[in-house]
Amino acid sequence: MKSNAPTFKVAVSKRSCSSVRKTSKKIRSGMIRKPSVSSRYRKHEGVNLYMSKVTPTSIPAPPQVLVAYIKEKVKTLNKSEVLMSLGNSNQLSSRDVKTKTKKKQINDFIAFRSYYSRLLNGILTQTELSTIISKHWTVDKQTRKNWELIAQEYNCDASGKHFFNWLEVNYGIDKQWLYEIVQYEECLTPTTKKPYVENIYNSGFKQRIDSPNQKDITFSQSDNSADWLVDPIFFDTEFLATSFDRTNLIISDCYSLMNSV
């Protein structure tokens, strides 16, 4: 005869429900221990950035090969246009990245190049800049390390700023070395002396000089050409009145000089 009773008993110990506590996500997030603030830790909005190396406190100095090239290039440029380009470099593409648009990640070389491309806009062409900084990049290890840390920090930043504007806010853009180059080259440029205006009542005469054929040429004989006439008002030094030929005085020129004074 079949029976539904169990043939043996098994003792099963059930875990108490009180030992398992469910916590909400908000509580669990608050229980996470925050890292201690140190020189190797920078806190950004929504991002905790850990650096294995200390980031630079300022933008690294420009390469010497780039400085030397700029000094030679500035000699061929208009100084006022160069100063205007330096003043407008902070105003180019100053818009922030849209919140809906994902910010592009940059590497160390792109960060290095985009900084100098924006800073030297109007001074060097893109071809000149790429040639110079690419050669320096391959040989200078410290430059690569510094810009690698700067690029990593920018990629973890959530402010949504363009790289150059982000550098200006967090590091500051130093243009003093560029202004010093422009002003130094401007001091070396020889200045043109202004014409010396003499008193027309004492020495405002035309001087008659010798012609190539060793004959004196007067104003009437030269077909109204003033190539052989030297006007003393364009001299830097004052001449005595006796050194001019008073017989070659042109009245119309004197009137024009008097009206211009």
From Swiss-Prot:
Chief place of localization: nucleus
Keyword flag NADP: no
Residue range(s) of DNA binding per entry: 101-158
Protein biosynthesis listed as a keyword: no
Domain of life: Eukaryota
GO cellular component: nucleus
Keywords for this protein: Activator, DNA-binding, Nucleus, Transcription, Transcription regulation
Gene Ontology molecular function terms on file: DNA binding, bending
Protein family: Belongs to the MATALPHA1 family.
Protein source organism: Kluyveromyces lactis (strain ATCC 8585 / CBS 2359 / DSM 70799 / NBRC 1267 / NRRL Y-1140 / WM37)
Gene name as annotated: MATALPHA1
Any Pfam family the entry gives: MATalpha_HMGbox
Annotated GO biological process: positive regulation of mating-type specific transcription, DNA-templated
Localization per Swiss-Prot or TrEMBL: Nucleus
Protein name: Mating-type protein ALPHA1
